[in-house]
Amino acid sequence: AEECSDLMKGLQYEALFKLEEGERPLRVLSLFSGCGGMDLGLEGGFACHARSVSNSEWIQQPLNAQWMLLKRNRFRTVFACDILPAARLTWLRYMRRFGIDPSVYHLDSVVDLVKRQAEGQAVFPSEVDVVTGGFPCQDFSLAGKRKGFDSAVSHNGERRKADAGDIPSEETRGKLYMWMKQVIDIVRPKLFIAENVKGLVSLGDVKRIIQRDFSAANGGDYIVLDPQVLHAGNYGVPETRERVIFIGIKRSALTPEALAALEREQVPAAFNPYPAATHGCTVRDPRLARPVTCRDIFGDLPEPAESVDLAQQNFSGAKYMDNGTQGQTEILLDGLAPTIRSEHHGNIEFRRLSA
């Protein structure tokens, strides 16, 4: 496949990424897959700034003085889905370097997929080890209207017609985590990971309700640990992004020692699946690496005319205006980038980042 990345061009992925002899891949079922952020994190084999890497054993090879190619992990995505065609195209364009079959990605709502499975179709794969899902966040986000479970949007992206008497249901966007729970009921993975925005934590009892509902999966056979809010800056990513993570582990897949440890009020570090901070952003510890900044990441970007990356070559001529309106934010090179909004309102257009 033609490589459109300045860093990754010319790499022979088939030769680089091979499982050790006798090593079994861990099969991942991905829901709400989008363009593959969570999937890529599990798969590995991506480019990463050297300052973001806290363990040299994770490095496959240097790409240049600043950027490293990480080793591929044992995780293999065997199922992915989303309702956005552009997301599927992006996912396939990237994942094809690993030889993943395009049929793995289903352009369907999780609601429709679960319904087809209930009708007798073999929709979901067997022997799934991990289920992941960043269930839709718009109804919980501080940047949105915070409708929560009372979402005005259906599972397929269509807006409910309030004036027509439509009422919220299990199929509205704010309740799609329940359909993720149904997938867990069906495939019974050893582990599941669900992700959403930090704003969910402060929206009434939403966090507690979601944790309780996930705990009921497969007849209560899952320990769902207390959700934690993780800050990207504490893990070598130059963003202020904060996300709440739910982790559920199948009781029957655990050793007695691990089960007892995970059921304790304070889970011992040796058994805690939540990662410890590697960089000192919001965590103050002199033993941690300094935060990675935007200057570290953007400092060696080639000029558009010198890049083979089409996304770098083509850009809007719109200019930064220091007037406080939406989208008028500068990136602080010696700090962390804010979360870039995924939607906008009004007659505006995309522009290059200002730093």
Protein language model features and the residues they cover:
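C-terminal target-recognition/interaction regions appended to catalytic cores
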Residues: 1-8, 26, 301-355
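Core alpha/beta nucleotide-donor-binding catalytic domains of modification enzymes
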Residues: 3-188, 198-204, 208
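Extracellular structured ligand-interaction cores
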Residues: 25-28, 78, 241-243, 335-337
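Generic structural motif
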Residues: 86, 251-253, 343-345
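Helix N-cap/coil-helix junction residues
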Residues: 100, 219-220, 342
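Class I S-adenosyl-L-methionine
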Residues: 113-128, 138, 142-333
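Short hydrophobic-aromatic micro-motifs
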Residues: 132, 245-248, 338-342
